[in-house]
């Protein structure tokens, strides 16, 4: 596909208007694939965050009174706009983020549209609750919008993660100030341009800028009714602390070191494909990536060479090329972090079975392209098995039986994703239930559709997204207790 032409400069989207940062600050957006300049973006200030919040609270006065049918119609309209501009948005995402166009065309953009449609359906199907407690009292339970939410989006799935946050917040009747990552803001800015005028002014606001500046202003802002964050556990902890200090809720989708478990009765070809899908999809920059591959000892000697061969055949290339299977890491900082873990693995006594280095020649030399990497001779106590690398790097750990692999899989501070590969459905269900994680796949990996709750155990987060239950996080409960009797309570004497 051909690259698209972007605006030379993007402002902040506040109260339905585009404006420069209050202090005029900007930053350059560059493609991680070739270092080319893409656009100039506004660096949001503290005053800009306050202005966006004020606009959102003003809009909330009327937005909260809209009916589910009205909001559902707008959500469906947004989904239609996304579909109509799929090729454009997909290419913007690939240019800005470095992920292959085949992923943005088939996963990121279409799934984002489906999230808006899903939550439109959820609110139309919601019927509320009323209970007759006894002959005297009727209890009505309502869920009301919580207010203005501060939402912070990561760089690994900028457009899709924005949909995960934006669709339910709008469905619930809330307003939002959304901050995409500085590393990949352009698809969200283009989205704001495309839906300009669809939502009432102030309902949806976009503030761009560095996490250390604009992101910190979001955390320090006093007027959000809730915070929602996807990103690292380290930053997520700060988000949780900021919310706790103000006694507001926070939804946190954080890091992972997920176990991808292969028993000897798995379908072998499917298993090899699944190991690649688990760690090479999106260049391994996936919070639930299958970065710990557990292989039963009876097939280990067959499995590892086959996986090495498969890894070495992966087509790494420029993200806008149709035949590219794996694109660029997000930036130079990230690829240096990945390479540092390769060195740590060597120091710990592990073996680099394939990859372990970046591309330094040809058309990929100017970008942050990593070779698919497999590390063997690993024990679960090594740093490369415990710490999130966030790249196309998997460790392979041998196990003997079911009890052993469950125990070792659970020996992690994280609990976000995981998978089990076997033809024995009873074994699959046992392992899926016993591994301490929020999402377990069986004979597949990295499927993240709407209507299936996604979120973590342990330090992998708080709350569940991509399911109607997230609406509970964006609303608050009101109980109306009605006395059906005209008689006094009898607690106090009457004349």
Task: Give the positions of each predicted feature.
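Conserved C-terminal structural/oligomerization subdomain of aldehyde/semialdehyde dehydrogenase
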Residues: 36-39, 261, 315, 365-495
């Amino acid at each position: 596909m051909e690259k698209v032409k972007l605006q030379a400069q993007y402002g902040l989207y506040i109260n339905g208007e585009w404006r420069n940062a209050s202090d005029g600050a900007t930053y350059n957006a560059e493609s991680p694939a070739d270092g080319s300049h893409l656009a100039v973006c506004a660096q949001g200030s503290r005053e800009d965050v306050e202005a966006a919040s004020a606009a959102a609270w003003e809009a909330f006065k009327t937005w909260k009174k809209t009916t589910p049918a009205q909001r559902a119609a707008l959500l469906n309209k947004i989904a239609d706009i996304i579909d109509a501009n799929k090729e454009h948005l997909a290419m913007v995402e690939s240019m800005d983020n470095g992920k292959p166009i085949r992923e943005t065309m088939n996963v990121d953009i279409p799934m984002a549209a489906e999230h808006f449609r899903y939550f439109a359906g959820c609110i139309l199907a919601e019927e509320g609750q009323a209970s007759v407690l006894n002959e005297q009292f009727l209890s009505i339970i309502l869920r009301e919008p919580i207010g203005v939410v501060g939402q912070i989006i990561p760089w690994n799935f900028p457009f899709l993660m924005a949909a995960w946050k934006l669709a339910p917040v709008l469905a619930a009747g809330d307003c939002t100030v959304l901050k995409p990552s500085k590393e990949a803001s352009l698809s969200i800015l283009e989205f704001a341009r495309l839906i300009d005028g669809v939502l009432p002014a102030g309902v949806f606001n976009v503030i761009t800028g560095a996490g250390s500046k604009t992101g910190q202003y979001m955390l320090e802002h006093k007027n959000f009714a809730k915070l929602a964050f996807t990103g690292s556990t380290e930053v997520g902890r700060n988000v949780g602390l900021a919310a706790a200090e103000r006694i507001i809720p926070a939804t946190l989708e954080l890091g992972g070191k997920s176990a991808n478990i292969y028993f000897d009765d798995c379908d072998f070809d499917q298993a090899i494909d699944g190991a690649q899908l688990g760690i090479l999809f999106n260049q391994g920059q996936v919070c639930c990536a299958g970065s710990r591959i557990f292989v039963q000892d009876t097939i280990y000697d067959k499995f590892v060479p086959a996986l090495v061969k498969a890894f070495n055949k992966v087509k790494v290339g420029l993200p806008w090329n149709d035949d590219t299977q794996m694109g660029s890491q997000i930036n130079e900082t990230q690829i240096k972090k990945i390479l540092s873990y390769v060195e740590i693995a060597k120091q710990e006594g592990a073996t680099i079975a394939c990859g372990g280095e970046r591309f330094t020649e040809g058309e990929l030399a100017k970008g942050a392209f990593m070779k698919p990497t497999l590390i063997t001779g690993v024990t679960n106590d090594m740093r490369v098995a415990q710490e999130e690398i966030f790249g196309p790097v998997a460790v392979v750990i041998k196990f003997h039986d079911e009890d052993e692999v469950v125990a070792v899989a659970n020996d992690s501070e994280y609990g976000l994703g995981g998978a089990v590969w076997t033809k024995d459905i009873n074994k699959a269900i046992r392992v899926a239930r016993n591994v301490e994680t929020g999402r377990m796949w069986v004979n597949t990996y990295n499927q993240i559709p709407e209507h299936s709750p996604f979120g973590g155990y342990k330090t992998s987060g708080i709350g569940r997204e991509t399911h109607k239950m997230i609406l509970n996080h964006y609303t608050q409960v009101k109980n109306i207790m009605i006395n059906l009797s005209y008689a006094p309570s009898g607690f106090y004497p009457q004349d």
